[in-house]
Amino acid sequence: MRMNRMSRARARTALALAVAGLAAGATAGAGPAAAQPKAAPAPPADCSAAHRIEQKLANGTTWRMCWRHSGMAGIVLEDVSYQPPGEARPITVLNSAKLAQIHVPYDDGIEEYADLTDQYFGDGLLNLTPGECPGGTIRTVRVPDARHSDSTDVKGLCTTTRARGHAYHLQSLKPDMSLGKLYQKQGKDLLVYAVNKVAWYEYITEWRFQDDGTIHMNVGATGSLAPQSYDAGDGQGWPIGKGAKAKALSHSHNVFWRLNFGLDGSSKGRIEQYDSKVSPPAPGKPAPSNKTTRTKVTKELAGDAKNMRWWRVVSATGKNKDGHPRSYELVPGPTAKYPGRGFTKHDVYFTQYNKCEQYASGNPHCPDGHPTTVDKWVNGQTLTNPVVWVNIGFHHIARDEDQQPMPVHWQGFSIAPRDVTAMNPLTPKELAGTNGQLDEGG
């Protein structure tokens, strides 16, 4: 049975209808620009044309992927590959990427929701209007149990491109230190996004694919504050409206993503953790020193972010033209970690692949007796096929400006290429011969 998150609102139907009415009203031979033998056309992503996304961006980078819809997770991306200029074939990055939970505990300790697995997040897909997908294509998504559409065919997935500003800026210098040539390029991104409604909240699930190989994964919460929760106690809410009569109840949004990497076509990547430590100036040295240490993560891990700590997923098979193993680095965004539940206590989890482990909590696919939350899956298994779970939290203390509608507040993270290519994939051809050299070519 699918739960109804709006249970507290039933006693206030008139108010609900009034708010609903408002809602209606990124050596020369190693450089990316070096001449390459003409390659055969890259094969399309392994899915039907209707579920295939392929976009060549203005700077020459091509992204390819498949998509499908899940009643719980919403839009799921699969077989994601990246082909920058100068690479003869696509480089597989991800086998799959999806939301794995939106955990919403309220500060009063009474209400707590799992918006994916309890509320069937995917069934709340909304139709998009052309104005919401400027310059792009709105794709039709089959949603058998669509909650907010008269049809099971929901026009709910936008793919478009968008300028992001400077990809780089280099003012070169001549030997006499006067200004030489200016190298600058404007970046372009592929955006893939959908909007899902869960009770009063609406969530924009966005993937942003830069022309330099970076992928941003974000969720934007918008819609409306829950009007049945304007009765918060002291220390658990914020006054909105006239005076202090209406206090919106504070709550958290703990968003999880599940990433199954497939770098260079292999799921057998490895995980590495890096920590840097700053020490006081040593005798005879004028400044502090900083040393970075690598730790190989060979077994499952519940990881906590720290200053100067980061992780990367390293390809088991692929190397760039410099002979360095390809990898992607995890770049978390701002977070407010929620310690109230075991599975929300950590920032990232690395678990051994198990087909039934699909959601960070409330996982419905595993057999009886199997733990249902991601923290319980970290039990010492050796990592040969790691799955990455990222947790980004946001503590929402409302403000007057949150009504009405509520401005989008974003939370998310990125994965950035580290040694995927031998140089910046957007390097101009005049600088292609500077790999590992200091000469700016100016």
PLM feature spans:
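Secretory targeting and sorting signals
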Residues: 1-37
